[in-house]
From Swiss-Prot:
Part of the 50S ribosomal subunit. This is Large ribosomal subunit protein cL38. It comes from Pisum sativum (Garden pea). The gene is PSRP6. Residues 44-60 have a biased composition (Basic residues). It is found in: Plastid, Chloroplast. Belongs to the chloroplast-specific ribosomal protein cL38 family.
Amino acid sequence: MASVSSIFGCGVSMAPNSSLRNKAIRTERRSACGGLLIECSSRPQKKSTAHHMKTRPRKSRLSDRNRKPTVYAPLPPLPPDFTIVIPADASTVDFTPPPPTPSD
């Protein structure tokens, strides 16, 4: 992953001790690249799945906790996808292919 200074093309300096930290931040803000200031969010948003997992409804009642899954009646068997139709007397049926169509 690229560093912040390589992305924006400006140097990022760190203050050596806490007494000089306020002065270093002030000078750094003035010399930011084109007036840009990079700040981190103090309260980043959750991604959608994490948000839904955190805010999902909980089972708080005893009747909800002990609830079993619903039992449904079994489904009837499905009809076949294909039905092969064979004439009663397949040996006497005369099959002639259709004549070819002339192409233009």
